Every structure is written in C-alpha cells, then in structure tokens.
UniProtKB/Swiss-Prot annotation:
Region of interest called G2, as start-end residue ranges on this chain: 47-51
PANTHER family attached to this UniProt entry: GTPASE ERA, GTPASE ERA, MITOCHONDRIAL
Protein name, entry field: GTPase Era
Gene this chain is encoded by: era
Predominant location: cytoplasm
Topology with respect to the bilayer: Peripheral membrane protein
C-alpha cells in the first residue's frame, strides 16, 4: 500500500512488537499463528531461535511487525550470551513488548527474573499467558494476578498459540496499540527474512527433530547458493557446520540415512513455502570452534560478544 493509498483509506498504524520470554514458552509458535504462515522455526528443544526473526501481520488498517526473540536464560557460552543480548535489544527497540509466560510453569525463577528486567523497558508491556489449555482456570487467574502484582501490564491475554485460542483477540489488540504511521513493508510480505535464510532455518529445524542431546546446539546451517532454474524449480546448496568429526558422522548417519531424511523433510517444506519444486543438496563440514567465529555470528544475525 502506497502512502497515497493509505491516506485515502484513513489513518494507518504500524509498529514493532517484541515477544520475550523463557526458552520454549511458545514465542515462535505464536508468531507463526499471528502471521498465519510459517516464518520462524519451532522445536520442543529450548533455544531454537537464535536471532531476531520478524513476522509481518496486517490487521485492518494496522501493520504489526512481530519480533521473535531468542529465549532468555542464564547464558554460559559465547553464543548463549549473544542470543540473550539480542533478545533484550529487541525488547528495548520495539514499540510494544509482549511478555510470554508458560501457564504450566507459572512464575518460576526464570519467569520472575524476566519480568523484573522487563520493568526497565520503557514501552508498554502486555502479559501473554500461553498454553492455557493445560492448566485449570483457577490457577490461571492466580498466575495472572501474581504477574500483574510484580509489573503493571497494560493488557493481559490468556491464549493457546498451538490451538489458536485467544490469538485473534491478541492480534486485534496489538493492531489498536501500535502507533499511528505508514506501513514499513508491502502488504503481501510476511517476513523480512530472505528466503535463503528461512530455508537454512528449516533445515536446522529438521536437525533438531532428528538429533538429540547437545548436537543440535553445536551445529549451524548456511545456504551457500540459491539458483532459480529455467524450468521454474530452485536449486539450493546448504552446509551444515559441526565442531568435530564424530558429530559429522552422527549427522550423516549409517549409510547417509540421517542426512537423507533431514534433506527430504527440509526439501518438502521449502517447496511448500516457495510453491515450486526444490532440489536441495546438503553438505556436512567440520569447523572447529565455529561458536567463536565472528563470521558465523554475522551469518546468524547476531552481534559477536568480545568477552
């Protein structure tokens, strides 16, 4: 929508809304539910989101730019510190902040620490209690009351991002609360992430679903090439970086079975999103201490912590 078109249709609103919370609280699932399409990866494993991923929603005359931040936790590694720093910078730079709580976990130490620190964010804060379908109503009301005692939230919503309950109400409220202004993105754009980045994230999601324990956290995926062919299909080459040769063997699997399965699932999902046939080629390489390589952080959209 051009500025002239927006003026002709009445006042528009546009703003950034950061979603913050502990790992696995459901931020990425909520972003996808609000957008109505997959723009960020989801896994039951914690710390899946590493950088700021923006999903874009049109609701009436409002454009809501959702910032899916990494989960906030006590950082131990350099990568952990970069992720937590990125999450808080996303909160401070936004127009509104949604603080997500897991209804089952309630106000545990992690949630309380996040609420305490959120008090320093100057913008309006919205409390979003997720996974409400798993908890009795009496417990939910007590949780909401306790959270609002700790911090004066502008609004409170109880939702299930997975089932969609309460998501429409939250979307409408965000549309009313973002500041007046012109749209930042075209109306048909659902994310600011390039497709080659989303494709790498999808492959990383499949690694999370196939492999267990620490290995997914010690790997990263980069899209090396993205070529649109004359027949309308896309040829994609990606590299999965791991830190040790033993990890490379795990990713490959016996007779290459694991990497084939990862590739097949990733190829199918990328094709569904792009709407064209996809030829995906995966390579697994050892890059020792990639977690200390500034170039890898830039590729992931993170600031490299110097200490």
């Amino acid at each position: 929508m051009t500025a002239e078109q927006q003026a002709g249709q009445g006042a528009t609103r546009c703003g950034f809304v950061a979603l913050i919370g502990a790992p696995n609280v459901g931020k990425s699932t909520l972003v996808n539910a609000l957008v109505g399409s997959k723009v960020t990866i989801v896994s039951r494993k914690v710390q899946t989101t590493r950088a700021l991923i923006r999903g874009i929603v049109i609701e009436g005359q409002s454009q809501i730019i959702l910032v899916d931040t990494p989960g906030i936790f006590s950082p131990k590694r350099r990568l952990d510190r970069a992720m937590v720093t990125t999450a808080w910078s996303g909160a401070h730079d936004a127009d509104l902040v949604c603080v997500l709580l897991d209804a089952k976990k309630g106000l545990d130490d992690e949630a309380q620490a996040i609420i305490d620190k959120a008090a320093s964010v100057a913008h309006e804060k919205i409390l979003v209690v997720n996974k409400v379908d798993l908890v009795p109503r009496e417990k939910l009301l007590a949780l909401v009351a306790a959270a609002n005692e700790k911090l004066a939230f502008a609004r409170t919503f109880m939702i299930s991002a997975l089932s969609g309950d309460g998501v429409d109400d939250l979307r409408r409220a965000l549309a009313e609360m973002v500041p007046p202004g012109p749209f930042h993105y075209p109306e048909d754009q659902m994310s600011d992430a390039p497709m080659r980045h989303l494709a790498a994230e999808i492959t990383r999601e499949k690694i999370y679903s196939h492999l267990h324990q620490e290995l997914p956290y010690q790997s990263t995926v980069e899209t090396d090439s993205w070529t649109e062919r004359n027949d309308g299909s896309i040829r994609i080459e990606q590299t999965i970086f791991v830190e040790r040769d033993s990890q490379r063997k795990i990713v490959l699997g016996k007779g290459g079975a694991t990497i084939k399965s990862i590739g097949a699932q990733s190829r199918k999902e990328i094709a569904e999103i792009t709407g064209v046939p996809v030829h995906l080629f995966l390579f697994v390489k050892v890059r020792e201490n990639w977690g200390d390589d500034p170039d890898r952080y830039r590729e992931m959209g993170l600031e490299f912590p110097r200490e």
